[in-house]
Amino acid sequence: MTRIALGAFLHETNTFAPTKATYADFVHGGGWPAMSSGRDVPKMMRCMNAGLAGFIEAAEAEAWDLVPTIACGASPSAHVTKDAFERIVNVIVDGIASARPLDGVYLDLHGAMVTEHFDDGEGELLARVRKVIGEELPLVASLDLHANVTPKMVEHADALIAYRTYPHIDMANTGRAAARHLALLLKTKKRFAKAFRQLAFLIPINWQATLDEPAKSIYERLAALESRAVPTLSFAPGFPAADFEHCGASVFAYGRTQQDANAAADAIVALVESHEDDFYGKIYSPDEGVCHAMECAKTATRPIVIADTQDNPGAGGNSDTTGMLRALVRNKAQAAALGVIYDPQSAKAAHAAGQGASVRLALGGKSGIRGDAPYQQTFVVENISGGDFVATGPYYGGRAMQMGPSAALRIGDVRVVVASHKAQLADQSMYRYVGIEPTAQKILVNKSSVHFRADFEPIAAKLLICAAPGAMPADPASLPWTRLRPGIRLRPNGPAFTPATKAPITG
């Protein structure tokens, strides 16, 4: 029987964010399932939109004998601590070593992890696994669409396969694709030639959305280029908030011959470069966006949905800035709701006050973001919740969410979801679990960039993007870069990065 070791370790690192990812964050998971290990992994990772879940489903259909090590992820943030990285990687590597003899290894990774002691978290992990399994055993990994792929990652994996949708509704499908490629490697007992290309400009995350052009057509062309000669081809637009040499978009292809791989990769690079002008769109200030939403809402029959993109916890934001809340209240928005503000202290105070009570709070604004501060006002506690529910929309895809003590607060006709844990508001259930019906609102403000669109676009009359203070600037050129590779453009057609000096890793 074919014997495959597997594991999952996912983190998207914004090196400019205020909060690091500790081991406890991986234990809880944030928007990811809670940490599981050994035989508990397949029990936990079923019937959900996750790479590991899709791989397990496909592997069981092949009747492979699976040897799980550990599965965990944490909300995007600043660097993964050395303690967390070493503890989790040791479980993976030791588990793989003790599972031998093996026929192959699969890892579900993000591809944009930076740690306190390594710029390239996934490259380091893959190198350690390769050292244990040797050069002959196939090693395949699935990656996030936002992966900052490095030469080290490409070197040590036999195949890297990235998501093709943003919102990421194909995470499980990517795991299935990884299983198919691993099966092909096992059947043919041959390695494919690799081609790896890095693009010359950073792509803002809002314009990486595959529901829109130019990404939509790029991924359609990418799928059409796959064949028996090129069994897998990926384009990762990257995560433009990790200050290290290999931050940015990349293309990676696997072909029967080097010529096949090179031709496929170069075709996608040329297509992306031809659309450099198109990775751009309208971004509103908080007041401008709220006023425009209020005007649209006068005639709309469905909610106007605003992305509070710069405080997106799915991109390293702390999900606690108050700029959009202030704009809603200042402009006297009606039938408006905002979520999720991460503030355990305020959630605790709301629970202590009780449903129906009025409570004075210093809400949010505790992460030290420049231009932001706690919002000190009196709120009505409309509802409270323990924070456990299932997110049923296309992005989370059935994940059990654990937001901790939570509440629906009201000020004027603006309602706010406050929670004790942070997760990107990408599911309608993240309003409903505290008693707010999203379809009944005129305006919704979601702390998200793109993932919310999977569940909210069907109920929205219009989508807007606003830039209130936050850790993930919509324009990557506004970040204080010091360690990128020389010459890379900081936005499409933007200024080129010129390093003052070679800076050391900063954790």
Regions inferred by a protein language model and the residue ranges of each:
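Extended hydrophobic packing segments that form well-structured cores
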Residues: P68, E273, V390-G507
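Glycine-rich phosphate/diphosphate-binding loops that line cofactor/substrate pockets in enzymes
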Residues: M1, E60-P68, D94-D103, V290-I304, ...
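Structural motif
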Residues: R3-A5, D65-V67, D103-V105, L137-A141, ...
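Active-site histidine-anchored catalytic micro-motif
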Residues: A5-E12, A17, F26-V27, P76-A78, ...
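Internal, active-site/partner-interface "lid" segment
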Residues: L186-K216
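N-terminal amphipathic/basic leader segments beginning at the initiator methionine
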Residues: M1-A58
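Low-complexity, highly charged intrinsically disordered N-terminal segments
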Residues: I56-A84, I88-I96
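Hard-cation-handling environments
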Residues: T2, N206-D413, V417-H421
